[in-house]
UniProtKB/Swiss-Prot annotation:
Membrane-related topology note: Multi-pass membrane protein
NCBIfam families in the cross-refs: PRK05326.1-1, PRK05326.1-2, PRK05326.1-3
Reaction catalysed by this enzyme: K(+)(in) + H(+)(out) = K(+)(out) + H(+)(in)
UniProt KW Transmembrane keyword: yes
Function per UniProt: K(+)/H(+) antiporter that extrudes potassium in exchange for external protons and maintains the internal concentration of potassium under toxic levels.
Family the entry assigns: Belongs to the monovalent cation:proton antiporter 1 (CPA1) transporter (TC 2.A.36) family. NhaP2 subfamily.
Keyword annotations from UniProtKB, A to Z: Antiport, Cell inner membrane, Cell membrane, Ion transport, Membrane, Potassium, Potassium transport, Transmembrane, Transmembrane helix, Transport
Official protein name in the record: K(+)/H(+) antiporter NhaP2
Subcellular location: Cell inner membrane
Residue ranges annotated for the RCK C-terminal domain, each copy included: 402-484
Signal peptide (from-to): none
Keyword Cell cycle: no
Gene Ontology MF terms: flavin adenine dinucleotide binding; potassium:proton antiporter activity
Length: 580
């Protein structure tokens, strides 16, 4: 390869990445997932469009694995362990039982549609059986879903790859050797994948955390150390036959949930790297496919995709979540709909090609077609479906910017910046009148171009910029303090006419609003009553019906319900209440 060829590759690669970024601005306007647009750029530049011929499956496999490792590391860093209280076991059930059911149901129909053997059909089912972390993390961000739904989908997508990889590799081995039966040794291999992946991911994450916190480096080197460490854990786990995908996700989880040096620098760097990984991966996969090869299989492939989306996935979710009573029907329906397929099925479809199996190209084309249908149909309808099934909650007000204050190695202090508009509650109030969360301080106040020294008598005006020092756990309280007036209206429409304290006694609530207890202990706190009726760990947005009224969890403090909204039938708004 001469210098001219190398330079041409640099130019083409840079143009494709730049084109993907620029065209992605159409995503929000058209309502099309950004991943579909990037995939389309690759297809347009490929053999049937721009004429770029790319058929190196080994390179695609390399790029795909590298990209997924970075994406899962970033996803783990941003997942809060606190969300595990409501979603760990349901998500693991979906990641194992759910994938198995989807594989079997999809595989049987694939065998019938394409006149294949049962094992070949099951291989197709295994290839497309898992949801994709890149697609889920990308499309769920900023949608305002309740914690139970978001955590279930994110943990499932981060942990279901071992099952899909295990089934795919096992079925490829059976086809290559002519086997037709299953044996108990396969279960041990699956346990090995999960066990080794979990052990090395958690252990390696802890070791990497100690390195980051104990070694003094230039600030820009910490993110690189984290990425290098994550990739090393991914590769080592794969080398000893564990699940590298699970390991790198758990590594990120450990790093993201412990005090770590240069947290914001690491998160900002990983955010950019995750975007680059997604762009590179979907560009390569778009270049790899030959669009005209998809036309002959379009009708049966569409039928298979719709079967998986409308039948196989919902049934797998129904069975997988059967033991978990806290999930409402609308939450199960939404989780069933967001069975997003992305890069993982296409990468798994490369396995049969590299193994030289008959019909390998058919498997690849089918996987690509199903991913395309999934992203277009499920991805584009996600916001609409979330509203239809009522799984969204009013978003918490957020500062316009936030930055870390590295006052010591594992400092968790941050600087939050709020801009005060005319609709803010605190306009006209003196600073001494504000009930700030304990441990927070207003460090500076900007008015126009002028920096003011804030004192207790300083009166807030429209357009002021407030710089507040605090911790991440102070954000909800600060958000309420500096929230906009329209937010209060939204809260009341969602949570109800009044908001009560969670520790209010049922007897007092019943007397206040004229409700019947019907044998219920009057001394029971309202929060405990809701937990009993809900039959599971509560999250903001959970609702129960009692005495013809709707009671909604409005504010959580860790595992405890702090405030509860009550909504009365139209025309019946008795008694006083507390506004949120």
């Amino acid at each position: 390869m001469d210098a001219t060829t190398i330079n041409s590759l640099f130019l083409i690669g840079a143009l494709l990445v730049a084109a993907s970024i620029l065209v992605s601005s159409l995503s929000s306007r058209l309502g099309i997932p950004i991943l579909v647009i990037i995939l389309a750029v690759g297809m347009v530049a490929g053999v049937d469009g721009g004429g770029i011929i790319f058929d190196n499956y080994a390179t695609a496999y390399l790029v795909g694995n590298l990209a997924l490792a970075v994406i899962l590391l970033d996803g783990g860093l941003r997942t809060r362990v606190a969300s595990f209280r409501v979603a760990l076991w349901p998500a693991l059930s979906l990641a194992t039982v759910g994938v198995l059911i989807t594989t079997v149901l999809t595989g049987m129909v694939a065998a019938w549609l394409f006149n294949l053997s049962v094992i070949q059909g099951l291989l197709i089912g295994a290839i497309v059986g898992s949801t994709d972390a890149a697609a889920v993390f990308s499309l769920l961000g900023g949608k305002g879903l309740n914690e139970r739904v978001t955590a279930s989908l994110e943990i499932e997508s981060g942990s279901n790859d071992p099952m899909a990889v295990f089934l795919t590799v096992t079925l490829i081995g059976m086809l290559a050797s002519g086997q037709t039966g299953l044996h108990w040794g396969l279960l041990g291999h699956l346990i090995q994948e999960f066990g080794i992946g979990s052990f090395i991911g958690l252990g390696g994450g802890w070791i990497l955390l100690q390195l980051v916190n104990r070694i003094n480096l230039a600030a820009g080197l910490y993110p690189i150390l984290v990425i290098a460490g994550g990739l090393a854990i991914f590769a080592l786990t794969n080398a000893i036959h564990g699940s590298g995908f699970l390991a790198v996700y758990l590594c990120g989880l450990v790093l993201g949930n412990r005090p770590i040096r240069s947290r914001h620098g690491i998160l900002h760097m990983l955010d950019g790297m995750a975007w680059l990984a997604q762009i590179g991966m979907f560009l390569v996969l778009g270049l790899l496919v030959t669009p005209h090869d998809l036309l002959p299989i379009a009708i049966p492939a569409l039928g298979l995709a719709l079967w998986m989306i409308l039948v196989a996935r919902p049934l797998s979710v129904m069975v997988g979540l059967l033991p978990f009573k806290a999930f409402h029907g609308r939450e199960k329906a939404f989780i069933a709909w967001v069975g997003l397929r992305g890069a993982v099925p296409i990468i798994l479809a490369v396995f049969p090609l590299m193994a030289g199996l008959p019909n390998a190209q058919l498997y690849f084309n089918l996987a690509f077609f199903i991913v395309l249908v999934s992203l277009l149909l499920q991805g584009t309808s996600l916001p609409w479906m979330a509203k239809l099934l009522k799984v969204t909650v009013p978003p918490d007000p957020a500062p316009i910017s936030r930055a870390a204050l590295e006052v010591h190695v594992t400092s968790e202090w941050e600087l939050f910046v709020y801009r005060l508009g005319a609709e803010k509650w605190c306009i006209g109030a003196a600073l001494r009148e504000l009930k700030m969360p304990e441990g927070t301080r207003i460090a500076a106040l900007f008015r126009g171009q002028q920096l003011l020294h804030p004192s207790g008598s300083t009166t807030l005006e429209v357009g002021d910029l407030l710089c507040v020092i605090g911790h991440e756990h102070d954000l909800p309280a600060l958000g309420k303090l500096f929230s906009q007036a329209p937010q209060r209206g939204l809260d009341l429409r969602f949570f109800g006419d009044f908001v009560l304290e969670g520790d209010a006694r049922l007897g007092e609530v019943a007397a206040l609003y004229g409700l019947k207890l019907d044998g219920i202990d009057p001394g029971m706190p309202l929060s405990q009553f809701i937990v009993q009726k809900n039959r599971g760990e509560p999250v903001v947005g959970d609702q129960i019906e009692w005495n013809g009224t709707i009671w909604t969890v409005a504010v959580m403090d860790g595992n405890k319900i702090q405030k509860v909204g009550v909504k009365f039938p139209e025309g019946t708004r008795p008694g006083p209440g507390l506004f949120l």
